[in-house]
């Protein structure tokens, strides 16, 4: 099964080797026919602490790195 790749914005870089990434998805409501925005935060592994708040990054699924980290930063 291929690994998912998502794109989002870094919202926190306070922890060592970890960034919080806000990923937004858009879809059309089936009844209202209105575009709806939903967002979700993912904690991703950042080996070199290279990314700062506001950076747009791509994250990829990986084996669990910790209790909450299942993603790692692929590129900016």
From Swiss-Prot:
GO terms for molecular function: rRNA binding; structural constituent of ribosome. GO terms for cellular component: cytosolic small ribosomal subunit. Keywords: Ribonucleoprotein, Ribosomal protein, RNA-binding, rRNA-binding. HAMAP family: Ribosomal_uS17_B. PANTHER family: 40S RIBOSOMAL PROTEIN S11 FAMILY MEMBER (PTHR10744), SMALL RIBOSOMAL SUBUNIT PROTEIN US17M (PTHR10744:SF1). One of the primary rRNA binding proteins, it binds specifically to the 5'-end of 16S ribosomal RNA. This is Small ribosomal subunit protein uS17. It comes from Ruegeria pomeroyi (strain ATCC 700808 / DSM 15171 / DSS-3) (Silicibacter pomeroyi). The gene is rpsQ.
């Amino acid at each position: 099964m291929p690994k998912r790749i998502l794109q989002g914005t870094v919202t926190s870089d306070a922890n060592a080797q970890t960034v919080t990434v806000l990923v937004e998805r858009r879809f059309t409501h089936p009844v209202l026919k209105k575009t709806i925005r939903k967002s979700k935060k993912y904690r991703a592994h950042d080996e070199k602490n290279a990314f700062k708040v506001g950076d747009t990054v791509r994250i990829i699924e990986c084996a669990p790195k910790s209790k909450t980290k299942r993603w790692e930063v692929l590129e900016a």
